[in-house]
């Protein structure tokens, strides 16, 4: 937008310098000096070079952004919505043990897999794999309800089945074994009677650890749109050493955020986990910030160069304005924007 203004100013200044020197033969020379000073090399690369650098980094992490417009839309938000799979991708949630109380293990696994699948949480894949290895099948569940305390309930064959954390079970009046040392256990009850305890282990992934610390450092707030009652800011603090100042909204908000979709896509994630997601968010902010700084630097360089060239041509100091000196001057002014653009992918 500013480039046509500078070009028009260069033409006007070139004409004024020619009129002042009263040498019409120098009009073309004055115009060439003014135009060369105004059309700096930094203008074409203020957006293109940072975008190229950021896009190359995102490609290595398995993600891509929809150009500068997509990055601009992403950087406007200072929060990211994280689901179960973002924080604990497949393979990081494992079963450490199983204890059954008065029921067949096949029935227990079938009921647990059914409730985990109904909750659509990160536990569903774990229990689906457990069910497949046991050779069982999921039951039909009705009247599925989610509870703020960290669990889900439903009816299977007319019986009330609850599936969730220890705190959830106590809130629902289910008696649990004494001296229970499980911090991330999952419990299953039928008609108010505990029938199984699953020791679930959450292993921190290195890429998620890096992503959470990067989000914390960049002051981007994670919003936990999780369905697994065990995944809380306290769990993140234990596993990753930081909760990144995560927001843990009410259940209704978490469910709505986890189901939200269908909007205009601004980025593409080709790998699971939080790292490519965080790379897109951080990269978009870096891209927009670098493009803004480079634009300001190019604007200042063009302004200073135009005014200086106008002064030198106006006073007739043509011995200073050699092609070589003008080229060096333009390159030096463009260097600051070039360095900023080249460092845009360092974060």
Could you tell me what each predicted segment is?
Residues 90-97, 164-168, 198-202:
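Short beta->alpha transition motifs characteristic of CBS
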């Amino acid at each position: 937008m500013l480039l046509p203004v500078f070009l028009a100013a260069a033409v006007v200044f070139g004409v004024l310098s020619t009129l002042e020197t009263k040498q019409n033969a120098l009009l073309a020379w004055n115009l060439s000096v003014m135009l060369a000073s105004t059309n700096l090399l930094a203008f074409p690369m203020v957006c293109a070079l940072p975008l190229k650098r950021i896009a190359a980094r995102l490609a290595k992490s398995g993600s891509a952004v929809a150009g500068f417009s997509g990055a601009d839309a992403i950087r406007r938000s200072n929060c990211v919505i994280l689901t179960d799979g973002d924080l604990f991708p497949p393979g990081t949630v494992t079963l450490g043990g199983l204890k059954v109380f008065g029921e067949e293990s096949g029935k227990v696994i079938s009921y647990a897999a059914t409730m985990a699948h109904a909750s659509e949480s990160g536990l569903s894949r774990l229990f689906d794999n457990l069910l497949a290895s046991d050779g069982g099948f999921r039951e039909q569940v009705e009247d599925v309800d989610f509870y703020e305390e960290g669990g889900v309930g439903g009816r299977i064959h007319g019986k009330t089945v609850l599936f969730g954390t220890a705190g959830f079970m106590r809130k629902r009046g289910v008696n649990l074994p004494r001296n229970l040392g499980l911090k991330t256990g999952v419990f299953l009850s039928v008609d108010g009677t505990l029938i199984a305890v699953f020791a679930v282990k959450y292993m921190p992934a290195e890429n998620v650890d890096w992503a959470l610390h990067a989000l914390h450092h960049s002051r981007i707030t994670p919003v936990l749109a999780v369905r697994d009652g065990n995944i809380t800011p306290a769990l993140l603090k234990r596993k990753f050493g930081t909760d990144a100042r995560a927001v843990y909204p009410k259940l209704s908000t978490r469910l709505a955020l986890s189901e939200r979709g269908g909007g205009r896509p601004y980025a593409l994630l080709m790998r699971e986990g939080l790292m490519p997601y965080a790379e897109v968010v951080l990269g978009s902010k870096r891209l927009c910030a670098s493009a803004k700084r480079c634009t300001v630097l190019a604007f200042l360089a063009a302004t200073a160069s135009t005014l200086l060239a106008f002064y030198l041509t106006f006073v007739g100091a043509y011995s200073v304005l050699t092609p070589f000196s003008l080229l060096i001057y333009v390159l030096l002014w463009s260097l600051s924007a070039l360095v900023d653009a080249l460092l845009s992918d360092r974060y």
